[in-house]
């Protein structure tokens, strides 16, 4: 099986807390160093651990904690042409009830990666942190760093207080469009901080239950973004759903199209099928890819939406349920493989093809 190039849309580095603290003004610095850094996570027990136990160097250092280690032990090993760095510690701060502290952390984390990580390797690209608990402050941060070299995206948590189609978030989308940046959401903070319960039914009892149900927040945000007219007001906006799976999309759009035909008076700004809007503006990453007992079922799902334009490979490194490039590529037919593994991401993030020696 030949993979001509690999662009990874979801990699999770972890910055040194001391380097973040250096960029925080008081009183935030002292508070950050004391360990109070935002709502965190629900901490359901995962018997595998969240981070892969084998993602360590020969000296026992975590690979995701160093730009040099990440380049050597992941990018070099899998021959990654580009990787989008989505720092995992920026998600929880977006659900803090204290927007000023959250905005300060976002700025500090962004500066660590822009000043220390991106210069370390030309293959690194970065999703800037934007804490949506105060959209105006988030928009200010996007305008501050959105034009910096290596910045390709704005990242927000999929856990949220209200759906992202509501007009309170328009300042974020306006700032992103000004800089030509897609906006992405990522799971993991559903149910923490100022977000609502992680499922429509309330709080689950186990990691298995919580993790399986994370797709619910993606569905809710997508319906909201489309029906509340975000892509009508911001026709240049692109939106990326990271780590939400794939196969739920076609049946959701069938239902949404059907309901729109009967209820279009409730969304008078929509003048075409919701599915057409989604196909034009929305992208999904592959991990965690569905694995049915009969692989042909997955391939049939790929025929039900424009996967060649919407799907981008993601490893989710170094998390426990990550997918390697070779594993992912095997799941896609030859005619689709290059689009998923690199071409769609290259076009979305405007990444020049690197010379290969």
State what each model feature region is.
Residues 183, 187-191, 226-281:
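Aromatic-lined glycan-binding groove of carbohydrate-active enzymes
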Residues 12, 160, 188-189, 226, ...:
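Catalytic metal-binding/acid-base residues of hydrolase active sites
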């Amino acid at each position: 099986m030949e993979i001509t190039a690999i662009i990874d849309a979801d990699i999770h580095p972890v910055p040194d807390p001391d380097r973040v603290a250096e960029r925080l003004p008081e009183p935030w610095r002292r508070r950050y160093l004391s360990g109070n850094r935002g709502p965190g996570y629900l901490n359901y027990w995962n018997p595998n651990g969240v981070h892969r136990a084998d993602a360590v160097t020969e000296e026992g250092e975590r690979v995701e904690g160093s730009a040099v280690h990440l380049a050597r032990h992941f990018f070099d090993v899998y021959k990654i042409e580009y990787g989008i760095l989505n720092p995992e510690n920026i998600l929880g701060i977006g659900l803090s009830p204290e927007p000023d502290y959250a905005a300060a952390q976002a700025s500090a984390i962004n500066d660590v990666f822009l000043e220390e990580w991106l210069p370390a390797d030309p293959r690194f690209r970065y999703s800037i942190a934007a804490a949506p608990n105060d959209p105006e402050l988030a928009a200010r941060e996007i305008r501050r760093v959105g034009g910096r070299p290596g910045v390709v995206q704005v990242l927000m948590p999929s856990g949220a207080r209200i759906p992202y189609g509501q007009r309170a978030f328009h300042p974020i989308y306006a700032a992103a469009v000004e800089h030509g940046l897609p906006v992405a959401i990522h799971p993991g903070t559903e149910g923490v901080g100022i977000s609502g319960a992680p499922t429509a039914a309330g709080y689950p009892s186990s990691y298995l239950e919580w993790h399986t149900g994370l797709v619910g927040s993606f569905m809710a945000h997508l319906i909201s973004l489309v029906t509340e007219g975000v892509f009508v007001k911001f026709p240049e906006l692109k939106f990326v759903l990271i780590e939400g799976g794939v196969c739920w999309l076609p049946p959701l759009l069938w239902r949404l199209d059907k309901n729109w035909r009967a209820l279009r008076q409730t969304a008078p700004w929509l003048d075409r099928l919701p599915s057409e809007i989604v196909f034009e503006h929305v992208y999904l990453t592959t991990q965690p890819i569905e694995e049915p007992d009969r692989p042909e079922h997955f391939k049939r799902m790929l025929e039900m939406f424009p996967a060649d334009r919407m799907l981008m490979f993601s490893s989710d490194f170094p998390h426990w349920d990550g997918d390697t490039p070779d594993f992912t590529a095997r799941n896609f037919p030859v005619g689709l493989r290059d689009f998923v593994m690199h071409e769609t991401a290259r076009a979305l993030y405007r990444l020049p093809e690197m010379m290969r020696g």
